[in-house]
């Protein structure tokens, strides 16, 4: 069991939640304010995507990331900044017998292009999504090939940024460990991502199986989406891991009650404390994760 817990808040994500929740952060100002709100509620880390301010759709615009990061860094919080580097892997294959006629949802770029904002802004942590995945129903695939992952891992290491390896299924963990064997990564973090169709399900058996297969001594966290978010907070802590909550993964605090990032962090910390633990401050989290000063 982990008694000193890193709490990550994923504040907006890239999902189709705008319009289903009254206050999904969309503009850089809103996203930065959400990260600051999470920090004030007790989060150790803020995990950030950006969205097109006009449409709310996910974006890779470096200028949007720059504004978010600058606003957080200029605030009175010292929350650890974790930027996604998973955008640019979206492939919507064509319908029926025309799979090569890619759909409008396709946004597919190379591994270094996915890291342009990381190269410029040098966050303390960035993500690396460790495998290809059938993402939801229909014809949408998230593409992250072994060659792309090796190139991304090398570049993240060169930049001195801590890699958070996003593990959506057991094969992703297998390949993440292979990259470690090849010396492509230095002391990465592992994030066990459960309940995203059609990766690994969010249940006790699955999280334990994946946690049991992590490299010895690895720093890891786990989360579930939707109604499994808080049960997986308890599960990850009991298994010795850290936790993640936030509007990226769950938009409800209780049935019929929209959540905020701050309220989700507070609920997670309540669970942690009731189990006899405590949330780490950003300064403590930096020491735990051996982060390089920025």
Curated annotation (Swiss-Prot):
It holds the Pfam family BKACE. It comes from the Bacteria. Keywords: Metal-binding, Transferase, Zinc. Pathway: Amine and polyamine metabolism; carnitine metabolism. Induction: Highly induced by carnitine via the CdhR transcriptional regulator. Not induced by glycine betaine or pyruvate. Disruption phenotype: Cells are incapable of growth on carnitine. Coiled coil: none annotated. Its EC number is 2.3.1.317. Its cofactor is Zn(2+). Zn(2+) binds at residues 47, 49, 248. InterPro entries: Aldolase_TIM, BKACE. It catalyses: 3-dehydrocarnitine + acetyl-CoA = N,N,N-trimethylglycyl-CoA + acetoacetate. GO terms for biological process: carnitine catabolic process. One of its GO terms (molecular function) is 3-keto-5-aminohexanoate cleavage activity. Catalyzes the condensation of dehydrocarnitine and acetyl-CoA, forming acetoacetate and betainyl-CoA (N,N,N-trimethylglycyl-CoA). Is involved in a L-carnitine degradation pathway that allows P.aeruginosa to grow on L-carnitine as the sole source of carbon and nitrogen. Belongs to the BKACE family. This is 3-dehydrocarnitine:acetyl-CoA trimethylamine transferase. It comes from Pseudomonas aeruginosa (strain ATCC 15692 / DSM 22644 / CIP 104116 / JCM 14847 / LMG 12228 / 1C / PRS 101 / PAO1). The gene is cdhC.
């Amino acid at each position: 069991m982990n008694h000193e817990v890193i709490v990550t808040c994923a504040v907006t994500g890239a999902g189709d939640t705008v319009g289903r929740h009254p206050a999904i952060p969309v503009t850089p100002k809103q996203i930065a304010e959400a990260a600051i709100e999470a920090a004030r509620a007790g989060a150790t880390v803020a995990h950030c995507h950006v969205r097109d301010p006009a449409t709310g759709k996910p974006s890779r615009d470096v200028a949007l990331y720059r504004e978010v990061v600058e606003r957080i860094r200029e605030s009175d919080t010292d929350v650890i900044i974790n930027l996604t580097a998973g955008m640019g892997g979206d492939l919507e294959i064509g319908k029926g017998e025309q799979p090569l006629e890619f759909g409008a949802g396709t946004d597919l770029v190379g591994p270094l292009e996915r890291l342009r904002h990381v190269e410029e802004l040098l966050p303390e942590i960035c993500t690396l999504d460790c495998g290809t995945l059938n993402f939801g129903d229909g014809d949408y695939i998230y593409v992250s090939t072994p060659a792309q992952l090796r190139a991304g891992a090398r570049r993240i290491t060169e930049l001195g940024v801590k890699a958070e390896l996003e593990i959506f299924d057991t094969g992703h963990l297998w390949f993440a460990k292979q990259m470690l064997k090849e010396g492509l990564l230095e002391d990465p973090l592992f994030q066990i991502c459960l309940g995203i169709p059609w990766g690994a399900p969010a249940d006790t058996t699955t999280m334990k199986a994946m946690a049991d297969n992590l490299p010895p001594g690895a720093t890891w966290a786990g989360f579930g989406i939707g109604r499994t978010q808080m049960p997986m907070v308890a599960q990850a802590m009991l298994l010795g891991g850290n936790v993640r909550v936030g509007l990226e993964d769950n938009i409800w605090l209780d049935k019929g009650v929209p959540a905020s990032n701050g309220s989700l962090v507070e609920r997670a910390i309540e669970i942690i404390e009731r189990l006899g633990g405590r949330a780490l401050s950003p300064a403590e989290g930096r020491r735990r994760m051996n982060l390089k000063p920025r």
